[in-house]
Regions:
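Eukaryote-biased recognition of electropositive, low-complexity segments
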Residues: 124-127, 143, 187, 191
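Local sequence-structure signature of Cys/Sec-based thiol-disulfide redox active-site neighborhoods
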Residues: 2-84
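Membrane-inserting effector segments that mediate pore formation, membrane fusion
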Residues: 171-197
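Ampiphathic alpha-helical segments that act as solvent-exposed interaction surfaces
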Residues: 82-88, 125, 135-169
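N-terminal leader/targeting and pre-domain segments
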Residues: 1-24, 149-175
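Well-ordered, non-membrane alpha-helical segments in soluble/globular domains
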Residues: 5-10, 35-49, 89-104, 143-155
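A short, hydrophobic beta-strand/beta-hairpin element that forms part of a small beta-sheet core
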Residues: 111-133
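Thiol/disulfide oxidoreductase modules built on the thioredoxin-like
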Residues: 99, 103-115
Length: 197
């Protein structure tokens, strides 16, 4: 789980984390921390997801950062409240909106962010995040008591990404496993643009 306070920083972080010729699947999660159900999901799952995904699946949190001084908390900047938040991970509403707007710039109208808890899986290839093929999951369509379905989705994707390095491979695995039967809100799209920052 990695901070993504702005799109340029996200691209730089990805570039620094991976070798130029490395290929992998990267997740970007859009989660407005000011919503009660999002707070609860993060508080109950963040540490587990962070340790469980390891290097198999890096997930960047749009609008989230680290090391906010408690005195700098405000109506738009909130330190996440979960045990083990030693780096003072925080949510920045203004940064979230900025990343969302930049993200939407690269997507067709039907695929733009629609103010819901959303996980987008993209390829990292040749030094860049690629949006020519991606998988988007509307996690809010999978809400249930204790967020069991969302936890299952993260576990499924993490396990799949141990051996898969392209969203096309993940799409094929999901089809083979008939994942659309139990995961709601999956969109698999082709977008012609590649992010160039």
């Amino acid at each position: 789980m990695i901070e993504a306070l702005n799109f340029k920083r996200l691209q730089e972080e990805v570039h620094d984390r991976y070798e130029y010729n490395e290929q992998c699947i990267v997740g970007i999660i859009f989660a407005r921390y000011d919503l009660q159900h999002v707070q609860r999901i993060i508080e109950e799952n963040y540490l587990y997801w962070n340790y469980n995904t390891k290097r198999y699946l890096d997930i960047f949190w749009a609008g989230y950062g680290e090391y906010l001084c408690p005195n700098d908390e405000s109506a738009t900047k909130k330190i996440l409240k979960f045990e083990g938040n030693d780096t003072r991970i925080y949510y920045d509403l203004e940064s979230f909106i900025s990343v969302k707007e930049q993200f939407n710039h690269y997507l067709k109208d039907k695929d733009k962010y629609k103010d819901k808890l959303q996980l987008v899986l993209v390829n990292y290839k040749k030094g860049k995040l690629r949006f020519d093929k991606y998988i988007s999951i509307d996690l809010e369509q999978n809400l249930d008591d204790n967020y069991k379905k969302i936890r299952e989705i993260f576990e499924y994707i993490t396990n799949a990404c141990r051996n898969l390095h392209d969203v096309v491979e993940l799409k094929e695995r999901m089809e083979k496993d008939k994942a659309k039967r139990w995961i709601k809100g999956i969109t698999i799209s082709n977008v012609s643009d590649v992010i160039n920052v």
